[in-house]
């Protein structure tokens, strides 16, 4: 169903059955399949391909040559009806690729709200991107990667499958991340190593000085004290009782499957 206020260019192809919301615009030479749903106010520019069971929220901007909901590149994929779910107010720039999920994992690829996906970024199957993230030009998020809220993955960086980039963390350009990046940490290099906290990001997002000092102390316990992670865990657990941000920082020590960058 196409809402009466939607504007579909005559050179676009929108298959019967697609749900196109109010005030959506679709540019020329764009192709949208029958199982796609696009929320109100979203702008889909020219030469975009949106396929499969893809649901896109409100007020997104999708630039030319983006491909969303295409079959993933996992060799186990057998044509199952897996999905892509995208939230609201995202900017998806030229030639970004967002692949559908696999039944071996969550069967869906998820992008939250208010994200910037820069030119030619690749979002592989079963990735989960939170809110307010920045994925740089030509960055690659491998299958099953999680990028938490307010994190940044800069240009030409690659995140290994199954890794997590924690909230407010920042991965510098041209980096290769093969283990989890804890929340708030600044990472850089091939293979990426920690370079302190993302202090600029913390200040921009309203973290107060006492909270930042607590995070700095927690960082030193993990990375500079010479203690094992098992020795550090009870210290951070005690700090986390007073500082919720420290809990978020230390939670990954319990959940990581690939280990954290060191």
From Swiss-Prot:
Involved in the biosynthesis of lipid A, a phosphorylated glycolipid that anchors the lipopolysaccharide to the outer membrane of the cell. It comes from the Bacteria. Keywords: Acyltransferase, Cytoplasm, Lipid A biosynthesis, Lipid biosynthesis, Lipid metabolism, Repeat, Transferase. GO terms for molecular function: acyl-[acyl-carrier-protein]-UDP-N-acetylglucosamine O-acyltransferase activity. Its EC number is 2.3.1.129. This is Acyl-[acyl-carrier-protein]--UDP-N-acetylglucosamine O-acyltransferase. It comes from Vibrio parahaemolyticus serotype O3:K6 (strain RIMD 2210633). It is found in: Cytoplasm. HAMAP family: LpxA. Signal peptide: none annotated. Pfam families: Acetyltransf_11 (PF13720), Hexapep (PF00132). Disulfide bonds: none annotated. It catalyses: a (3R)-hydroxyacyl-[ACP] + UDP-N-acetyl-alpha-D-glucosamine = a UDP-3-O-[(3R)-3-hydroxyacyl]-N-acetyl-alpha-D-glucosamine + holo-[ACP]. CDD domains: LbH_UDP-GlcNAc_AT. Pathway: Glycolipid biosynthesis; lipid IV(A) biosynthesis; lipid IV(A) from (3R)-3-hydroxytetradecanoyl-[acyl-carrier-protein] and UDP-N-acetyl-alpha-D-glucosamine: step 1/6. GO terms for biological process: lipid A biosynthetic process. Homotrimer. One of its GO terms (cellular component) is membrane. InterPro entries: Acetyltransf_C, Acetyltransf_C_sf, Hexapep, Lipid_A_LpxA, Trimer_LpxA-like_sf. Belongs to the transferase hexapeptide repeat family. LpxA subfamily.
């Amino acid at each position: 169903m196409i809402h009466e206020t939607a504007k579909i260019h005559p050179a676009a192809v929108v298959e019967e059955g697609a749900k196109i919301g109010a005030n959506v615009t679709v540019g020329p030479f764009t192709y949208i399949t029958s199982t796609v749903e696009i929320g109100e106010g979203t702008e889909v520019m020219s030469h975009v391909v949106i396929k499969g069971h893809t649901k896109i929220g409100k007020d997104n901007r999708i630039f030319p040559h983006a491909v969303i909901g295409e079959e993933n590149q996992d060799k186990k994929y057998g044509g199952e009806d897996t999905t892509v779910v995208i939230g609201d107010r995202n900017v998806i720039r030229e030639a970004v690729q967002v692949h559908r999920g696999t039944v071996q994992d969550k069967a869906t690829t998820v992008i939250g709200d208010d994200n910037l996906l820069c030119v030619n970024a690749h979002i592989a199957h079963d990735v989960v991107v939170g809110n307010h993230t920045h994925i740089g030009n030509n960055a690659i998020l491998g299958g099953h990667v999680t990028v938490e809220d307010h994190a940044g993955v800069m240009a030409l960086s690659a995140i290994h499958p199954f890794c997590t980039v924690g909230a407010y963390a920042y991965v510098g350009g041209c980096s290769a991340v093969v283990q989890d990046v804890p929340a708030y940490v600044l990472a850089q290099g091939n293979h990426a190593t920690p370079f302190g906290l993302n202090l600029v990001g913390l200040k921009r997002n309203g973290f107060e000085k006492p909270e930042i000092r607590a995070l700095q102390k927690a960082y030193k316990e993990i990375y500079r004290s010479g203690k094992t992670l098992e020795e550090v865990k009870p210290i951070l657990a005690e700090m986390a009782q007073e500082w919720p941000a420290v809990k978020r920082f230390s939670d990954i020590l319990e959940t990581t499957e690939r280990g954290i960058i060191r």
